[in-house]
């Protein structure tokens, strides 16, 4: 390389360093030089601060090319209105002008795939709903993947160039594995859903899936004192604790019990049959109680008619179970009388021990709710088929 060319290159790099000075400027200069060698354009570098992961972003489809919604519509033969609905469903910024060149090319291609499903006869509204649910789930997965990858390459004293090279090298090996892994996991979920969610007689007669509510039992379990714990430990430690609870709940959950979601320091489980759900919740509380690294757990359970929408559940038992959890004592599994009713004439037959905790008025719930504590073991006799017990926390949620 001649001195003239080297001086020109140095001038170009200098233009991309902004107002950095000293060691930071020298470190950024090495990164920028490497990025240019990887084919990253100066405009991309200027638009990204810091540009550590630009080379890695190229590996996952960000080539710096932007297009308009109309271009995507015309290039892929997708209805413009459907495309814009799908773009909003996946979380892209709302842009009313279809000719605005603001969409990443790869993002546009992903959204355009929805057209094919509509052509196969699927309801466009349902296609948009599926896209939204996928995007929400995959956004959480992407966040976890980012943290996992960075944890693998970050080292004390690592320079910007070290991180950029390490990220590119690792992700280049990971990218070919992601598609097959996600496909396999999705198919696994579809298989289990088809196994546990058979088409019922009413749906066959109606000729369509019935959207109405159905009888289920709902449970919430949350960590006691989690909010106060946030005042004495770091946010990262809190997140790790909540993640451990979610992982433990998933480990203990098997069909017909479904792990639905986490809400901060709480987990939500649902089952068509109350007995397997009670068994799972009792196991969860028992395991947490034996782990000194966990705060104590409490759980609330209720049965009733609820409806499923986009992976979540809505209805009276959801509200009641949440409120019951809020009045349970640490280490207790507290259930509404609707659960005993759902179990039928012999609630003790499944090996549960019941104790009456009294009636309670719960915020947002009409009338008093009769509450029981459920444990494992032989049945204790008493008034109403259950012994008297005081398992209510001192204040209503």
From Swiss-Prot:
EC number: 4.6.1.1
Region (Linker): 192-206
Record's catalysed reaction(s): ATP = 3',5'-cyclic AMP + diphosphate
Record: residues binding Mn(2+): 222, 265
Effect annotated for changing residue 312 to A: Loss of adenylyl cyclase activity in the catalytic fragment
pH dependence as annotated: Optimum pH is 6.0.
UniProt-annotated stretches for the region Catalytic domain: 211-397
Role noted for this protein: Catalyzes the formation of the second messenger cAMP.
Domain notes: Consists of 3 structural domains. The pH-responsive N-terminus inhibits the adenylyl cyclase (AC) activity of the C-terminal catalytic domain. The length of the linker segment (aa 192-206) is decisive for regulation.
Misc. remarks from the entry: Was identified as a high-confidence drug target. Binds 1 C18:1 fatty acid per monomer.
Protein name: pH-sensitive adenylate cyclase Rv1264
